[in-house]
Amino acid sequence: MSLPLSVFIICYNEVDRLGMVLESVVGLTDDIVIVDSGSDDGTVELASKYTDRIFHRDWTGFGDQKVYGEKLCKYNWVLNLDADEVVSPKLFKEISDLVRRDPKNSENQAGFEVAVKMVASLYDRRPARWLAPTNYTGRFYDRRYAGFADSSVHDKLHNRESGSVKFPKLQGEIYHYSIKSYEHMWSKIGFYSEAQAREWVMKGRKPRLGLVYLAAPLFFMKHFLLRRLFALGSRGFVIALALTAGRVLREAIAADFYKNRDQ
């Protein structure tokens, strides 16, 4: 029996990953909302096997797309997933139990953070490694009390009353299949870097290119050691290097935008 909660996903050309995401929520809900930005690789056709609630919307930024998606949901309890994130069996049960116990959210709980754990490869179907890079982020919430902010880059969930982005943590995990290939990884880093740089310049933030050059080794150590990319072996080493290069690239693009902003 499906529960009074909605799942919504924003996507673009995700035919190779969306299927396993949708499979992971089968039986959890009767309301799966897909917001597609113009896929031409079969993503929409794949999604239609799981839901008829598929909406086209030209890309306007991560936060704005999610604001649009949550408004389309039928229920107040909402689980947001990216198109490369798989719900673990433990999280499936945890969310099911929570909604079944209090379907109308009588305690007015705004939301919960979920551990999003990185999986090294799209082709690795095992659960994420114990020490794999993990990021806690708000994903399961009551849209009356929490929601996403309009941003071209960031998609942080926030409490509508207090503005806080901190929520209680659930025990279950989301498995994050973020990298299809190294080529895909570089393309993704380039896209994020340009979007972030544009947002910085629009907000009046000046680039700090010299400082970033000097700090690049520290950025690498942060990703490789503190964020535990070492747990992914040689692939983690390459990812840490790429993320460090992306940080420098972001400042370089911002410097160009800042230099040419009045031309």
Residues of each region from the PLM?
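Cell-envelope/extracellular polymer assembly enzymes that use nucleotide-activated donors
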Residues: P4-S6
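Acidic helix N-cap motif at the loop->helix transition within catalytic regions
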Residues: G19, D41-Y50, K90
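Short beta-strand/loop segment that forms part of the nucleotide-sugar
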Residues: D30-G38, F55, A83
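Catalytic-site signature of metal-activated, phosphate-bearing donor transferases
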Residues: D64-E70, W77, S88-R261
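Conserved donor nucleotide-binding strand/loop of the catalytic core
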Residues: V44-K74
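Short, well-formed alpha-helical segments that are part of the catalytic scaffolds
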Residues: F8-L28
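A conserved acidic beta->alpha catalytic loop
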Residues: S24, D36-E45, D82
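Active-site acidic short loop of glycosyltransferases
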Residues: S2, C73-N76
